[in-house]
Amino acid sequence: MDGVIVYCLNALVKHGEEINHIKNDFMIKPCCEKVKNVHIGGQSKNNTVIADLPYMDNAVSDVCNSLYKKNVSRISRFANLIKIDDDDKTPTGVYNYFKPKDAIPVIISIGKDRDVCELLISSDKACACIELNSYKVAILPMDVSFFTKGNASLIILLFDFSIDAAPLLRSVTDNNVIISRHQRLHDELPSSNWFKFYISIKSDYCSILYMVVDGSVMHAIADNRTYANISKNILDNTTINDECRCCYFEPQIRILDRDEMLNGSSCDMNRHCIMMNLPDVGEFGSSMLGKYEPDMIKIALSVAGIWKVL
């Protein structure tokens, strides 16, 4: 057809960084189809975000266990984040197309203290209206739709009834470093001849690495160059798949080599703090409460350097 021109992307753009941005960042997020099919209409903006919230998940499961005498678990590690602006008070519809049987929506209101919205909840049997102020959480019954009125930002999590989770570990070897984002890994590891650690990374106005290593607590702050490096990469979640078990079957643990982790970072104690270095990430200065065990710290620090594998 006249007027149609097809170019090779590399020949047309000729800028490597932008070509990589197009290839890597413009993609459908690999999350469960049930989350993708939450229909959001009306005057709202929405996004799909990773929401690893183990304490929230446990709290919701405790509430549901008291109501239904059954435990629940997250359908997906992703969540729907929506921003609602209803200046004319017109209800904005939010509901799940498929209404999966036994799905329990949990709605978290976030945003400004003055933001207020109403949830108009309906099912085949009844209707209800509740007010949801900022930082309130609503746990809805199964098989319902809801509409909103007002101004608010909402996080929508989907839960369903769960059976006891399969063990994460089948066997262990002395030279293994085993990591998982699931806290129950600590309960499955042997209590002798092993040490346990916990890591979290946050990057807002500064990058902070929080580590608990065999009971010792470290609070490490990145220098400016390291902060810039972490900030650039922390938003890249295109390589993270869901583990919903209906669409994605991602492994829930990673097994690493102890010697590689020992050689993957360094740390030195001085008069003021512990200086930590991750060759591919940068440098941190850390306070410490507890016993200084350099080998344990280096293993945990090296794991922090490859945090995106989970």
UniProtKB/Swiss-Prot annotation:
Induction: Expressed in the early phase of the viral replicative cycle. It comes from the Viruses. Pfam families: Pox_A51 (PF04948). InterPro entries: Poxvirus_A51. Keywords: Early protein. Belongs to the orthopoxvirus OPG181 family. This is Protein OPG181. It comes from Vaccinia virus (strain Ankara).
